[in-house]
Curated annotation (Swiss-Prot):
Biological process terms in GO annotation: DNA recombination; DNA repair
CDD domains, alphabetized: TOPRIM_recR
Organism: Cupriavidus taiwanensis (strain DSM 17343 / BCRC 17206 / CCUG 44338 / CIP 107171 / LMG 19424 / R1)
InterPro entries listed in its UniProt record: DNA_Rcmb_RecR, Rcmb_RecR, Rcmb_RecR_Znf, TOPRIM_dom, TOPRIM_RecR
DNA damage in keyword set: yes
Zinc finger (C4-type): 59-74
UniProt name for this protein: Recombination protein RecR
This protein's UniProt keywords: DNA damage, DNA recombination, DNA repair, Metal-binding, Zinc, Zinc-finger
PANTHER family, alphabetized: RECOMBINATION PROTEIN RECR
The keyword DNA damage is annotated on this UniProt entry: yes
Domain of life of the native organism: Bacteria
């Protein structure tokens, strides 16, 4: 007769499977490692996940992750408020920050257009992006919008849509240079390549 795992262990394995790239076997190995070798680490992990889930929210201005209503980047008067960089995820924002070449503000889409998956303009907050880029009470109108979506087919389609939307409002719109490889995602590109792509950006 096949032995069954305790219910709480099964629940842990299933919970770990929500992580990207983690299949059933990997989740099982993680669960057994935590319980067999690092129970204190497991408790800290649980507390950290619970704390983040309870306290992290979206910035009301740029939509990135923050614990406040407005994030520190949006509140930083030392940054160039005339330039707005549009990225897909907070992880992409971190990658651009690590280049130390960009000192403007951001807007985070939290995704990209993918009609086959039911992700349209509303799901990636393009109405909020338009307001952020144009309305004075939100810091607009900005002098330039840099579209830094990934160079995947969905990212390119998103960049084109955003470019047309903002150019119709008279805004200058640019795109990262092709230093980032086709199909590449910013999260996995080195900082030097991203820095060059930002500096050599082209008009849309």
């Amino acid at each position: 007769m096949k032995a069954s795992s305790p219910t709480s262990l099964q629940a842990l394995v299933e919970a770990l499977r929500v992580l990207p790239g983690v299949g059933p076997k990997s989740a099982q190995r993680m669960a057994y490692h935590l319980l067999q070798h690092d129970r204190e680490g497991a408790r800290k992990l649980g507390d950290a996940l619970r704390g983040a889930a309870d306290h992290i929210r979206h910035c009301q201005r740029c939509n990135t992750f923050t614990e406040q209503e407005i994030c520190e980047t949006c509140l930083d008067d030392r940054r160039d408020a005339s330039v707005l960089c549009v990225v897909e995820t907070p992880a992409d924002q971190v990658m651009i920050e690590q280049t130390l070449t960009y000192r403007g503000k951001y807007f985070v889409l939290m995704g990209r257009l993918s009609p086959l998956d039911g992700i349209g303009p509303r799901e990636i907050h393009l109405d909020r992006l338009l307001a952020r880029a144009t309305e004075p009470e939100l810091g607009g109108p900005v002098g330039e919008v840099i579209v830094a979506t990934n160079f995947t087919s969905e990212g390119e389609a998103t960049a084109h849509y955003i470019g047309e939307m903002l150019k119709a409002r008279g805004l200058k719109v640019s795109r990262l240079a092709r230093g980032v490889p086709v199909g590449g995602e910013l999260e996995y590109v080195d900082a030097g390549t991203i820095a060059r792509a930002v500096m050599d950006r082209r008009n849309l």
